A protein has these predicted regions:
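Active-site hotspot residues in diverse enzymes, especially metal/ion-binding acidic/histidine motifs
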Residues: 1-243
C-alpha cells in the first residue's frame, strides 16, 4: 500500500481526533494553547501496544522496532548473535532512551521513534489480508529515509511510517496553535540550518511545548509551509553583535 502525503495527513487527522476524544474526553475541543501528543498513552492505551526497552544494536543505529506477530529479532554483535523474542503488537525501543543522564536529552527522539512504530501498526491494519500475511513474521525497524532512497516496498513503508508518525506527534492543528502562540503565525526563515535569534527562540519554544526535537520540528514545519528556505549568504540577524 503506497499512500500520498495528503492521504497520510488525513489518516493522522482521523487518528488524533479519535484518540483525543478517547483520552481527553470533553476537553478535546476546548480553546487552548498547543499541547504535546501523549504518545505513550496513544501507544499503550489506545493502540494496545506493549512498549519495552532493550539493546537493539552494537552501534545505536536501530532506535526501535515493532512486531505484527510473534517472531524474533536477531542481533549480530562482536562475532556472535543474540536473539530477542518479540510478541505480536510489541514495540521495542533502544535502552539508550532510558539510561541515566540521557532521558531528557533523548526525549524528543524517543517520542518520535515511538510515534514511528505506532504508525507502522496503524498502516499494517490498513493493508490487505494478503499483505498482512506476508508481513506477519517481519518486524519493522526505525531507520531514516529520504525520497531519493525509496527503491523498494520496505523503503516506502519506512518513509510512510516516518511521515505518519510525524503527523501524529505534531498534528497540523497543534502546529497551527503553536505557531500562532510562539511566532505570531509568521513563517520562519531557514538559512541552510541557521535561524535568526527571534526565529530560533520561537522554534525552541515550539519544540519544548510539543516534546519534539528541532530536526523533527523543522521537517514538519517545512511540510506545513511554516518554514522558508533561503541561502546562507542572505543570512542577517539584527540581534547579533560582532566584536
Amino acid at each position: 500500500m503506497i499512500l500520498s502525503h495528503r492521504q497520510i495527513e488525513e489518516i493522522a487527522a482521523a487518528v488524533t481526533k479519535d484518540f483525543n476524544e478517547f483520552f481527553f474526553g470533553k476537553e478535546a475541543d476546548e480553546v487552548r494553547i498547543a499541547r504535546a501528543t501523549p504518545i505513550d498513552q496513544l501507544a499503550k492505551d489506545y493502540l494496545g501496544l506493549n512498549v519495552s526497552f532493550a539493546r537493539l544494536s552494537y552501534d545505536g543505529s536501530i532506535c526501535g522496532l515493532t512486531a505484527y506477530a510473534d517472531t524474533e529479532y536477531i542481533i549480530e554483535e562482536m562475532g556472535s548473535s543474540r536473539t530477542i523474542p518479540l510478541k505480536r503488537n510489541q514495540v521495542l525501543l533502544d535502552e539508550s532512551f532510558i539510561k541515566p543522564g540521557q532521558v531528557r536529552q533523548l526525549c524528543g527522539k524517543r517520542r518520535f521513534t515511538l510515534a514511528h512504530e505506532c504508525a507502522h501498526q496503524i498502516l499494517f491494519q490498513m493493508e490487505s489480508d494478503e499483505m498482512k500475511e506476508s508481513c506477519e513474521k517481519k518486524y519493522a525497524a526505525r531507520t531514516a529515509y529520504s525520497l531519493r532512497d525509496l527503491k523498494s516496498r520496505e523503503d516506502w513503508n519506512e518513509w510512510q511510517a516516518n511521515v505518519l508518525g510525524a503527523a501524529i506527534l505534531m498534528p497540523q492543528k497543534e502546529i497551527d496553535l503553536a505557531m500562532w502562540y510562539f511566532a505570531a503565525g509568521r513563517t520562519l526563515i531557514n538559512y541552510e540550518g541557521r535561524f535568526s535569534y527571534k526565529d530560533r527562540f520561537s522554534l525552541s519554544l515550539l519544540c519544548q511545548q510539543l516534546g519534539v526535537s528541532k530536526a523533527a520540528a523543522v521537517i514538519r514545519l517545512r511540510h506545513l509551509g511554516y518554514i522558508e528556505d533561503r541561502p546562507y549568504l542572505e543570512f542577517f540577524d539584527p540581534v547579533e553583535v560582532w566584536a
